[in-house]
């Protein structure tokens, strides 16, 4: 007879690890205990030596689906008088617990909520040890029900029995609940008056969406605005009310099959769509509908829900023949027909060849969104603000935007926005890392011997990070730091991470930009706690994030194209070719610099920099195509034109600004309506054409933007189409980035290349440059965002390198 104490750290709380341990111990006829603590999980086993060894081996080989073991320490222990194996109360002590992310319903839970004979039929908060909420409901560790927002919902007898059933998948499932004891929905008017509760609230909300109303929905990590994506009038109404005139809206498809009617879905994209994280996935639209999918075969029939104002009749069905279908949607009084045979509203994603699609990721989505429906599911917050999650605030801010609010009484402890992913060259690329991914840590070997650091990230797409030894824990996407609420959320979430993960930073890492709010906060934090501070150049941190993910120790050429970043020479960078090795960085080449007339306002109004280019190229007599272009500019452009020769302007080598300039010259717009708006539309224009390489000078390690802009204007003079010029611009930039990269690699004997920065979210550019440089080993970020959301990870990695 032997006895052992086993300490396990990693993602071992909130994923069914203790029930797994208990079942395994019973199977091997071991006695003992298992409990959570803030380090992870502590196990005591007692039994035959072979059984104990088998137990330790299977802890690792049979680990639950969403778990991860980082360390496993086995120590000999004293024998005790025990008769069984039990899950005991958790123990609180400072330590190393990791927390799992929120997960979409598992197959077993889905089967229950879709089974009319099951007691959880259509229950919107169904979960088990394999799925459901985690990060958004946890107040503190160890992970027990009384330390979550579920503590106010005592379990009923059947739920308690499930919780205690060793063989069941709800054995010690902390959020376990049913419609008799758990959270419930209520549908309310915007003045707070309750209209309906429970399942009736969900069905009535569905009815109102199908009728053309806008409903605010309290989700897993915050509020969404929901409307029918097939009704253009209501989508336009949503845009008008929210003040979001152009930015593409994400949609939720009721099923994968419904999504396939509107977008192309590869096998990898399908895997991402159906993953437990359930992010929004950017997918290519089907521009021409297959007639077989629009019209069913002759005499075919199908069922639809008939939703009456008397919701007691909600489940009645009606048969409609194919011949009746074309008029059925328009002529039924309630207008509830929602079918994949109808086209998507043009105003959902105007001018876009892609569509952001998410599948149902909470149990209530399966009751709310019909399987054949396509609904707008967009965050209810203002652009750049953090996700809206407070109930009182939601009523205040959504009055005048939403017609109704579908809310529930489970408190959101930690808000999270939807994550966004796109697949490029068969690899999922992270655009926004939030729900479903945070707070899962990223393993970074180089951090193993580093002290705990706080990396503040950047001001755009803000996300900070902390590390515990070799694990980087990134915060959710928070928004842009120009908004006060994001600034407040930064401090709130930083304090929360320190408490939740029991971390106390001993160093602070910030962006070198002296005016970044995040950098100022980091300096204030360091001063408050008397900590050393490390400054990291912005684009070096972009490269560092990829080095952290890929564990690269060799020298690399970092090609970083983004919107802006403070350079070592005091100008703004953003079109960079950097030699990077460990903590060393050297600028080898870059895009040529151009001024930003008016400073920050020129970022929002790209016509200003475009006007500078035009006046440099044609100081006396511009071609007629440019004269016509000037006539399209906002009022007051003549004043700026006269001032240009006398203005002191900051210089920028930004690739993002070059995209904006070309978009303005092509007439796609002169002012950004949302972040990267014009660059995105320029990419969309290029998708339908095959580009040619235009003249662009490459001299003395500088790619000359001026000659490329001249080439663009020459094409306009020749009457080339906007789509063709857009494709030519992309093709040219791809070619010359490749040529400059090859020159740099040859000169410095480099075989590894890193592609990073927000501009490389452009699928054409990223795929093109990867193909152009296929003779090298190419590295791109996949676990952290390509944009500034990944900066904090790079800051952590470089901070650790600078201490070696």
Model-flagged regions — what are they?
Residues 511, 530-542, 751-753, 763, ...:
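Conserved phosphate-binding/catalytic loops in two-lobed NTP-binding clefts
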Residues 1-175, 179-186:
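Intrinsically disordered, low-complexity, mixed-charge
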Residues 260-265, 367, 387-394, 439-450, ...:
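Conserved phosphate-binding catalytic cores of ATP/NTP-utilizing and phosphoryl-transfer enzymes
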Residues 62, 162, 371-447, 647, ...:
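Internal gly/pro-rich beta-alpha loop/helix module
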Residues 175, 182-184, 458-496, 614-750, ...:
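A contiguous, well-structured pocket-lining segment that forms one wall/lid of small-molecule binding clefts
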Residues 539-561, 565-567, 606-615, 660, ...:
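Glycine-rich phosphate-binding/hydrolytic loop that grips phosphoryl groups
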Residues 216, 502-514, 533, 749-759:
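Short glycine-rich phosphate-binding loop at a beta-alpha junction
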Residues 76, 214, 222-287, 343:
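A phosphate-binding glycine/aspartate-rich beta-alpha loop in the early core of alpha/beta enzymes
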